[in-house]
Curated annotation (Swiss-Prot):
Active site per the UniProt annotation: 172 (charge relay system), 372 (charge relay system)
Organism for this UniProt entry: Mus musculus (Mouse)
Listed GO CC annotations: cytosol; fibrillar center; lysosome; nucleoplasm
Listed name of the protein: Lysosomal acid lipase/cholesteryl ester hydrolase
GO BP term (any one): ATP biosynthetic process
Superkingdom: Eukaryota
Enzymatic reactions: a sterol ester + H2O = a sterol + a fatty acid + H(+); cholesteryl (9Z-octadecenoate) + H2O = cholesterol + (9Z)-octadecenoate + H(+); a triacylglycerol + H2O = a 1,2-diacylglycerol + a fatty acid + H(+); 1,2-di-(9Z-octadecenoyl)-glycerol + (9Z)-octadecenoate + H(+) = 1,2,3-tri-(9Z-octadecenoyl)-glycerol + H2O
EC number(s) reported in the record: 3.1.1.13
Amino acid sequence: MQLQGLVFVFTIGILLSRVPTGTVSAVDPEVNMNVTEIIMRWGYPGEEHSVLTGDGYILSIHRIPRGRKNHFGKGPRPVVYLQHGLLADSSNWVTNIDNSSLGFLLADAGFDVWMGNSRGNTWSLKHKTLSVSQDEFWAFSFDEMAKYDLPASINYILNKTGQEQIYYVGHSQGCTIGFIAFSQMPELAKKIKMFLVLAPVLSLNFASGPLLQLGRLPDPLLKDMFGQKQFLPQSAMLKWLSIHVCTHVIMKELCANVFFLLCGFNEKNLNMSRVDVYTTHCPAGTSVQNMLHWGQVFKYRKLQAFDWGSSEKNYFHYNQSFPPSYNIKNMRLPTALWSGGRDWLADINDITILLTQIPKLVYHKNIPEWDHLDFIWGLDAPWKLYDEIISLMKKYQ
């Protein structure tokens, strides 16, 4: 892998040597900032909190307790929790400019905004007893995110704010773990006022794109290719590429196309001046086991717990020889859902099936021209989506 990386960097260097001078844009300062620094750069108060899960992981949660102009409002603010998708982190909600990022818009609308980070991403790489160098640290998938991360994060927020309920907004895998947690743990579901679902991925029957090709490979081969620990974390090489490649006018489009190749194409709706910021925060990493789990969702055509590879191991974990399926029909939360017509991962045909399984669906909107990333980075997201989210949450106060 190291040799391939050197060859790639060398090739990029040759390409850049042929790019005319004067075509390099300035590096955005947010490239070198953490999430709290990005929040504060735009004039908002920013906080970082540490949450201990039941199985010993230490997660970071970022908070925007109020907007820029409503410092002195009386009484507690309604709380909203934002949960990122696969290979992402809390920065997703604040890496557009202030009037285009959901995190900032919610704060200005009077909400107390909390942004989670799943175990294994850039901001959640700690454990009480385990080190990231140990295989045991990485023995998790979205099962554990639903079983441990969400309850710990939600209960921490409720204890900190004194609230009894929160709004939950999920994107992609952030929806997946919400559906699992709220259908499996009714006591946790009682703490959610409304479930707002953006581009949910629960099945991959109709999904497409290069990322899905990994799901066709046998698990042992994937482990040989990627190991058993971390998958696609932020790294020094990625940051170098973001700063030295993605700031070139000609190369920005190439950097953006990496995202489009994975998620679907809607080139005109991405703020190209922010590409270097996006790529220095995403991908943010996950475990190889989590990627194997998504491969199993693709192969088995259903949402179920992780298959440990043998009847004996499954029996040890589940008291049965095969992994149990998740029944989201058990979830009884008011749910609003938004989908995209060009979304390769949350395909509209999978969404159509999902809609029939949500007992308390209160709203659905499909945006025909949107891909998977428009929900977090789309230039038109403020008026096509975020205004509706804010209106619905205020309606359900």
